[in-house]
Amino acid sequence: MFSGARGLHGWILEFVKLYKPAFYISNAKYLPRLMYFFRTHQLNPLQFKFIFSRKGLNAYADVLLCFNGHPYKEESKPVKDFSGLKIYHLMDYTYFPKASNEALLAGGVDFVFGYARHDLYCPFFQAKYPNFRGKVIPVPFGFADRFQEKVPFADRKNKVIALGAVNSFSDPVHTVPDFQKLNDFYLSRGEKFMHKFRRMLVEHEEEFSEFMDSKLPHYPQVKDFSYDMVQTFNEYKMFVSCESLQYFPPAKAFEGPAAGTVMMCSDHPCFRDFDFEDGVNCITHKEFDLKDFQSKVSYYSSHLEELEQIQKRAGQFVRERYNHSAVARHVFDEVSRVCSKN
């Protein structure tokens, strides 16, 4: 289903290239954007089928996939009278959750893609999308080709780097109507920062300076785009990840190892679901436990042979499993699996 969405994950483009799905054009006004999409990504429109009517869609397709996100928007609302299986990617499901959930239900959506098993791990999702428990298909971000190992392990700083956003529920960027329900939900639970562990690290930057460097923004700043992510990864042996209070592995969980940097993350099962294993292809610490985090950094920074073996296994692991083509094939397999059962 195409409605003129501006951006897309790299694996979605690979999915289009690999499987040549038909495109359902929800409104003719999106045709110029579709042509721009094809031209930008050097796709041959003659290799694809285009469908412009609900009747044609029902006659041709068994499954309707939508990667637009924002189902509450008119251009992305689910096609209610499509008789086949409907699977929608929620993307950032924190935007206007009530309207999004109502649109999914009204449109008869059967399953949703998510960045992890949100129905098991994210209390916000559980509260706002109760009808989709057991109906979430987890899809990892994967990593772009630019994330390459450029600096040998031995030449990197023997420290951990903390980087990424530190979103809050009260900063100027997020105190907008889109996030009102999200902010209210977590503030009522006594939480101030979406990236809770990163905020804990910010508060201990000086104390941890001997073993940790930090590029984490300080409130009210929540993001920092002033540095090159690939270059920064290549400067360090380890980096620290954060699953946020939404509990999903961020893109950095795949990008960092692809760039040759060992991930340190919590022992939350959202990482294990994607086959990250402590001491094998990552290093885990107890959730929100700074003492355990410090202990793990101390151990591996003095056991570099073990750390280098983890680095090698992790790099091979993510390059085989989480390149965009591999993620696209995973999505196709998951859709096929769901179809066979419904």
Residue locations for each model-derived region?
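Nucleotide-sugar donor-binding catalytic core of glycosyltransferases
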Residues: 1-253, 264-275
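Short amphipathic alpha-helix in glycosyltransferases
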Residues: 86, 160, 282, 297, ...
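Acidic, glycine-centered active-site loop in nucleotide-sugar glycosyltransferases
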Residues: 99-100, 274-283, 295-296, 313
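Short alpha-helix at the nucleotide-sugar/activated-sugar donor binding site of glycosyltransferases
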Residues: 256-258
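Phosphate/pyrophosphate-binding active-site loops
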Residues: 261
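Conserved acidic donor-binding segment of nucleotide-sugar-dependent glycosyltransferases
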Residues: 282-288, 299-304
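A charged, aromatic-enriched C-terminal amphipathic alpha-helix characteristic of glycosyltransferases
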Residues: 302-336
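Generic C-terminal helix-cap and adjacent flexible tail
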Residues: 336-342
